[in-house]
């Protein structure tokens, strides 16, 4: 192969490379949504532990106010440009033949053990999750069974401004609590009480 033949084909070989470089560029690209959005519960089974007292790592303000949030989520889009209203209802039939992992039957959280802020959750514009506040009453904390995973609040989405994701339209929300003295304690010979290896459950909002 002579020198002139090689020089003749160098521009032809370089052309695809130049086209590749000019076709690739950085920048923001917008991708279309799926065409519709849906609402759902992220978890169908959930244990919410109300942790009373203080924690240096976790904000327990809601816990000490005996409150927690029941949340729904939206999917199918890259953003939420409006408030999405989700109506729900407590559905005791969701607990039919339901048991915890150890075989203990789930017990419906008595209606006098809690107060719902309403029967509608709102996912605010700009957010993909929103909920309603649940306030636990003194009756809940007076029940010794509440310190164990016993009671469940079964909730089902009944209507929404968007479609409802099938199979994730409900959640079984188990509620329990730990008081500030929960844990393993030892007493020294002089009568002093020392806390050792406390049982700690991370608070989840």
Stretch-by-stretch model annotation:
Residues 18, 154-157, 205:
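Short secondary-structure subsegments characteristic of cysteine-rich extracellular domains
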Residues 139-175:
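Terminal connector regions
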Residues 168-205:
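Ser/Thr/Gly/Pro-rich, low-complexity flexible regions
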Residues 25-116, 127-131, 141, 145, ...:
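Acidic/polar, low-complexity intrinsically disordered N-terminal segments immediately downstream
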Residues 1-11:
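Bacterial N-terminal signal peptides that target proteins for export
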Residues 19-23:
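C-terminal motif of bacterial Sec signal peptides marking the signal peptidase cleavage site
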């Amino acid at each position: 192969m002579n020198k002139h033949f090689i020089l003749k084909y160098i521009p032809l070989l370089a052309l695809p490379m130049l086209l590749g470089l000019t076709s690739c560029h950085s920048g923001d690209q917008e991708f279309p949504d799926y065409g519709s959005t849906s609402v759902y519960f992220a978890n169908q089974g959930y244990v919410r532990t109300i942790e009373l007292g203080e924690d240096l790592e976790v904000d327990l303000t809601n816990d000490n106010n005996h409150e927690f949030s029941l949340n729904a989520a939206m999917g199918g889009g890259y953003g939420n440009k409006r408030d999405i209203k989700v109506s729900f209802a407590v559905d005791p039939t969701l607990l039919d033949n339901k048991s915890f992992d150890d075989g203990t039957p789930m017990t419906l959280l008595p209606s006098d053990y809690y107060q719902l802020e309403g029967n509608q959750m709102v996912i605010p514009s700009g957010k993909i999750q929103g909920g309603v506040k649940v306030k636990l009453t003194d009756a809940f904390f007076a029940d010794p069974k509440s310190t164990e995973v016993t009671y469940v609040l079964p909730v089902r989405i009944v209507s929404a401004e968007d479609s409802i994701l099938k199979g994730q339209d409900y959640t079984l929300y188990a509620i329990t609590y730990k008081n500030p003295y929960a844990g393993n304690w030892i007493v020294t010979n002089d009568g002093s009480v020392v806390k050792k290896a406390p049982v700690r459950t991370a608070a989840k909002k």
